[in-house]
Each structure stands twice: as structure tokens, then as C-alpha cells.
Amino acid sequence: MHLTQKAPLKAALLTLALAASHGAHAATFQDEAIAFATNNPMSLTVKGDDVTVNLTTNVSLLPGVHVEQKDEAPCPIGLTTTNENGNDTLTIKRVDSTQPCKAVVVVNLPEKSTVGFTQRTPSIDAKGNFGKITTHAEHMSLTFEGRADSLELRAAGVATARIRVQQLPISLISVSARHVATNISLPAGATADYKIDPASSTFDKAVPSGNPSDTTIRLTGSTVVGAARNQ
């Protein structure tokens, strides 16, 4: 998702790297959650056999939701919007899921709005190879390296990964607009790989009280690269 720094409306770009399905795999991990906040533009890329994506926001989606074709071959995408309990849900569904393709769905959001979606990730193995996070001063990117049969808002009976993106006032983050704070919660056995630069960036790991099976990693810095394990 790309959230422009100075525009009053935030344009969130969801890049779908859509591949053909190769069959489901059993899930043997707990729910994972990632929440991050930054005043810098953000880029979110999801790779895998994504067929359906549901985005839900705490405010009404602004007009202008559309699909941008990024490959020479067309990537037909259907968009529908529903409202439940004051939350808008945008369903992004591939029209043809038999061929790999890529498209960008552009969503306009008001300032300080939140966006969330739930991802079915049945192929993430018991070792918990969760993904990779990289950041620098201008944008943040989050990549899931495993395949996903679909992305769903509600996926009853399956293990899910939940992502929440929240745009915050710059005063709550840093006066320099270059500070990024990331909180990552991983299940037992999961790993998270990322980079840390400059050396002045800080990295803290702690086990939340009352739940020793989960490890929370807090990453602070303009750009960070490193590795963390739940141990």
C-alpha cells in the first residue's frame, strides 16, 4: 500500500502477484499478527496463488477504487464493496484464476484510517518461515514468500495471518518523518528476517507476559536488517 505523505487522501496500492493454484496444504501454526505504523509511503506486496482479497476499513472507502493493469497480459479483477457494522469491505477477486497474472488495486483512504485483511496461508510450514520485512526512509515493504490459496476477511476453521496498517500523525512517530516502528507477533517456532541500517537503529525482543509461546519483536529505525527467532 502506498500512502502519500502530503496528500490529504491516502492512496493504498495492493499489488497482487497471482499464480495458478497447486493444491492446498495443511496448516500447523497459530495465528500471526503484524501491525506497523509509519508516516512514510508504504508498499505492500503479496505473492502467491491469491484468488480473493478482502480489505476492510474502519471508515467508508472513498471513491476511486480501481484496478491498474501492470503486465502486458490482462489480469481481470472483479471489485465489490459491502458495509457491515460501519466497516466497508472491498472484495478483490480474480475473474480467471487459471493463469498467473499481476495487477494493482488502488484504494483511496482518508487520513488516519486503518486497513486490515486476513490471509489464508495453508502452505506456511511448521517451521514458521513467515516472510520478510524491509524498510527504508521512503517506503516500507512486507512480502509473504509462501503461497496462499486465497486472502479472506473471515476464514473459518483455518489458520490465518492478520495484517493491520494504521496511518498515524507524524508527531506520534518522529519529528524527522524517517522513524519507523514495527511490532511483529510470531507463533512458537516462527521466524522473521529483516535488515537494520543505520547502526543507531534499535532492536528489542521480549516475551509478552502470560503468553510465553509467543515472541514479540519490536523494530525501530529508518531501515533495518537482521534476523529474529522465537527462542
Predicted regions and their residues:
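Sec/Tat signal peptide C-region and signal peptidase I cleavage site
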Residues: 22-26
